[in-house]
Amino acid sequence: MLKGTYIYYQDGQEIYRSSNVITKYGKRFLTSFLAGRDSFTSKSMSFGIDSTSAQDTDTRMGFEFYRTPVLFGSTDIQTVNDTTTYAVVYKATIPQDVAGYITEVGIYPEFKDSLTSYDSKFIADFDNQLDWTNTPLITSTNARVGQYLLTMSSNGTSAKEYKSNIQAIDLSGYSVNDTLKLAYVKNDANLQNIIIKFYSSALDYYSVTVTPNAGTGYKLSSDIKLDNLFSNASTLNVDPSNINQIGITITPTSGQSTSVGLDALRINDEDTFNPNFGLISRSVLTTPLVKLAGRQVDVEYRLDLGF
């Protein structure tokens, strides 16, 4: 029986460990690897902020914010009182400059394996107020992706839009089944919705409306299919291959004012099938691990082999 555990170290001392679920893909992949059909020479560890329980049907992380190559692998064979245990150990490092609130970790068979450039990626991490119009407030309170998030407010009782110029991204190769996901902080009960816009020019954009989750506090939106984005264009002239600006509109409920903390926005490639790439294992931490900037954390994935 295979048993996987992630072990976290800081300054050489163990600070946490969490057990994993090996996914259905992972079981197939490891079986093929033992049969010599698949390569496992390159690996990567992924870290995220979603706390949804791990299932063997997971195909990706809930909300990944950092991925790093596995530095090396080794074996650990020990005999105690005539009982021998066998394990494979993979190690990776989260460097000093990365900060985040780790609630999930996973391992993939390769660091980067995409059949096209239209893979899962970050679109915005909301860590620099100077990148946005209307001067949102910057704060470290409740930030989970990086050190900071931006607080965007309504214009009193009216909606207010914040815009940021970005390096052009190409959405033309994503399908209607791919998804967007937003990480945000709902500060009060007066939020009606958040509208995300993708501009190719000042008048030409796609938009999608995010209905806020119930309650206040840190939230992850549901998966937003790109079908909902592409079907809502301001004109017929939107160029999906040249999205160069993002807009975030904060809309309060009638007669109220509101504010929202924006933490991260990413796009997930949901339907590009590659039999050699997928989530092998996922672990959800019972207690979140706060990774501070300036401190390196080493992570070990130990796969015990029940021979």
Region roles according to the model:
Residues 1-103, 108-121, 130, 141-160, ...:
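Small cysteine-rich, disulfide-bonded extracellular modules of the LU/uPAR three-finger superfamily
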Residues 92, 182-184, 196, 248, ...:
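Preference for bulky hydrophobic residues occupying beta-strand positions
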Residues 103, 242-246:
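Exposed beta-strand face motif in extracellular beta-rich ectodomains
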Residues 119-130, 164-171:
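Beta-sheet-rich sandwich/jelly-roll-like modules and their strand-loop junctions
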Residues 247-256:
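Short beta-strand-plus-loop segments that form exposed binding edges in beta-rich domains
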